[in-house]
Amino acid sequence: MQTTSSQPRAIYYVVALQIWEYFSFYGMRALLILYLTNQLKYDDNHAYALFSAYCSLVYVTPILGGYLADKLLGNRMAVMLGALLMAIGHLVLGASETAPLFLYLSLAIIVCGYGLFKSNVSCLLGELYEPADPRRDGGFSLMYAAGNIGSIIAPIACGYVQEEYSWAMGFALAAIGMVAGLVIFLCGNRHFQHTAGVNRQALCARRFLLPNWGWLLVLLVTAPLLIAVLFWQEWSVYALIVATAIGLAVLARIYLRAETDKQRKDLRLIVVLTAFSLLFWAFAQQGGSSISLYIDRFVNRHIMSYEVPTAMFQSINAFAVMLCGMVLAWLVKESVNGNRTVRIWGKFALGLGLMSAGFCILTLSARWSAAYGQSSMPLMVLGLAVMGFAELFIDPVAMSQITRIEIPGVTGVLTGIYMLLSGAIANYLAGVIADQTSQASFDAAGAVNYSIDAYITVFSQITWGALACVGVVLVIWLYHSLKVRTRRLAVE
């Protein structure tokens, strides 16, 4: 394995691919809800339903993508195929401006590509290191930070291109980014020769009437068509129900097979953390839907004579995550003293509290809009930044707990279940919540008048809902704190 003095050379090609994948995914995501409502003239109900269905299914398909990589394709081929599908999907999405029937197919292709890419790029990175290599953690941190760079730049670049040229050009820029990442990755192909490749024996093995490579081709053709039908008929919720039922059944099986009380206790903790994470992300994912439309309709986006494109506001969250994450890493050191469970609940309370504070600021912004016609941009930026800061106290804490569990062979499964619930189900619930803002009336000329009161109500309800979650978490935190203190007093 060729290395520099610090990291394997191959990591820089993986990091480049990750930057451009984030650029592609978040650039398109920043435009999607605005494209549906402003260009295709979907009503808010339809737009929210399709947006939440798309954001939900991108968290379901990585389960199948991981299986295909493990059994047939290998991580490297799965990542390349996924990147290619996402690029094609973004190009087809641009064509839907003149042929709306392409909309569902394009989103389905992106979902399939994301499934092959997302679950396997981290596994490919892991293949670059020996199990005990001390550089491993640094490599994953580098990839995560690089991804945030892509998600910061993407809404700015794609939003600007869309505003100055066209929607098709905005989506094409996302596709170009993904192609650029794939080309860079292919240029470093010689550095990945030691990683697992395609399982030729398994691909050529016959099953039923066809070899496995034939069934793989059938899957690559039919899966996008099937998912497109789910989008078209708004049947995505049924796929989520099936996936959730399977995930919960697997979780119950793991719990029943746990051998010690400590293992069962850790599993119960993970389940409760996942429940609060689900609620947190149902609130946080308003950023791409209801909050985006609120900014577009009710926020003064002018800086002198220039009007800031709505999509650019999607960069604030990612920027806050990266900046605050670096500050926290520098200022805060994990204490080895005290009870870890107590610390976990303290962090969750802080994360949910910050989410409540962020939506409180948005509620003030909406009330300002109701009083003066439009709200100020700095108030909006502050609210989004606080919400981004909140993320640092939820997912990293929950994922850390999952990786610590002392049950062999279940970490990957539990991670998948966590992503299913806090990703797919949370995005579906986010769509249900966002739909409450879709109240509108029509004036005499037939123009739509959107209700600012609906946004005030929803933002206020989320503020109080997140605050209620904080109250419950603080009760749990207090219970564990008193339990630890009682135990210490008994020992003394």
Curated annotation (Swiss-Prot):
Q: Does the keyword Transmembrane apply?
A: yes
Alphabetical UniProt keywords: Cell inner membrane, Cell membrane, Membrane, Peptide transport, Protein transport, Transmembrane, Transmembrane helix, Transport
Q: Where in the cell is it found?
A: Cell inner membrane
Q: How does it sit in the membrane?
A: Multi-pass membrane protein
Q: Where is this chain primarily localised?
A: membrane
The molecular function terms in GO held by this entry are: dipeptide transmembrane transporter activity; peptide:proton symporter activity
Which GO biological process annotations does it have? protein transport
Q: Name one GO cellular component term.
A: plasma membrane
Q: Which InterPro entries match?
A: AA/pep_transptr_DtpD (IPR023777), Dipep/tripep_permease (IPR005279), MFS_dom (IPR020846), MFS_trans_sf (IPR036259), MFS_Transporters (IPR050171), POT_fam (IPR000109), PTR2_symporter_CS (IPR018456)
> Any stretches that span the bilayer, and where are they?
14-34, 49-69, 91-111, 138-158, 167-187, 212-232, 236-256, 269-289, 312-332, 344-364, 379-399, 413-433, 458-478
Q: Which domain of life is it from?
A: Bacteria
Give the function comment from the record. Probable proton-dependent permease that transports dipeptides.
By sequence similarity, the record places it as follows: Belongs to the major facilitator superfamily. Proton-dependent oligopeptide transporter (POT/PTR) (TC 2.A.17) family. DtpD subfamily.
NCBIfam families for the chain: PRK15462.1, yjdL_sub1_fam
Name-wise, this protein is: Dipeptide permease D
Origin organism of this chain? Klebsiella pneumoniae subsp. pneumoniae (strain ATCC 700721 / MGH 78578)
